[in-house]
UniProtKB/Swiss-Prot annotation:
TRNA binds at residues 14, 64, 66, 112. Its main location: cytoplasm. Keywords: Cytoplasm, Hydrolase, RNA-binding, tRNA-binding. One of its GO terms (biological process) is rescue of stalled ribosome. This is Peptidyl-tRNA hydrolase. InterPro entries: Pept_tRNA_hydro (IPR001328), Pept_tRNA_hydro_CS (IPR018171), Pept_tRNA_hydro_sf (IPR036416). CDD domains: PTH (cd00462). The active site is at 19 (proton acceptor). The lineage of its organism: Bacteria, Pseudomonadati, Pseudomonadota, Alphaproteobacteria, Hyphomicrobiales. PANTHER family: PEPTIDYL-TRNA HYDROLASE. The gene is pth. It is found in: Cytoplasm. It holds the Pfam family Pept_tRNA_hydro.
Length: 196
């Protein structure tokens, strides 16, 4: 069993924010694999699918980003899931827009959602870092991540969420390198020379 977590802030006001790309990718996975409707549990919204023969619990914490660990910790304890079987989809400032990297453990790179999760379950969980680019100046970061994606970014955001969903079975199997490679190829196929 794996716990697949998408990070974001709840509510319509935040729905299109760059910080919510984890929610967007999780929603795409739920749609593409015909997940039952999300229901409230663990201070979040949960559903369940099967990926590559693995039971996969989908979790969108509803605690606001900075307290995501409360929801993830609660789910992990109840489901008796080890950190190595938890995969967190989140926005990543330090990657160019549309790029994806998977890593296990390590620091939080200033990401408050990851900081909270690490405080609750330790840092040995897997992270799917979804690149949103950087505004160029640290002083602009807060407004940038809490700002909506521009209309000009819609094509790559949609292509990235679809590519993550299409490659999700590889994540479930622990084939992180193959997951990254497939996303790169899918993005290239979808956007051609317009890959960001």
């Amino acid at each position: 069993m794996i716990l697949l977590v998408g990070l974001g802030n709840p509510g319509k006001a935040y729905a299109g924010n760059r910080h919510n790309i984890g929610f967007m990718a999780l929603d795409q996975i739920a749609r593409d694999y015909s997940a039952p409707p999300f229901r409230s549990k663990f201070n979040g919204l949960i559903s369940e699918i099967t990926l590559a023969g693995e039971r996969c619990v989908l979790l969108a914490p509803q605690t606001y980003m900075n307290d995501s660990g409360r929801s993830v910790g609660e789910a992990a304890r109840y489901l008796k899931i080890e950190p190595k079987d938890i995969v967190v989809l989140h926005d990543e400032l330090d990657l160019p827009a549309g790029k994806v990297r998977v890593k296990t453990g390590g620091g939080n790179a200033g990401h408050n959602g990851l900081k909270s999760i690490t405080a609750h379950i330790g840092n040995e969980y897997r992270r799917v870092r979804l690149g949103i680019g950087h505004p160029g100046d640290r002083a602009l970061v807060h407004n940038y991540v809490l700002g909506d994606f521009a209309k000009s970014e819609a094509a790559w955001v949609e292509a990235l969420c679809k590519a993550v969903a299409a490659s999700a079975p590889l994540l479930a199997k622990g084939e992180d390198d193959a997951f990254q490679t497939k996303i790169f190829k899918d993005m290239e196929a979808a956007l051609g020379k317009n890959v960001p």
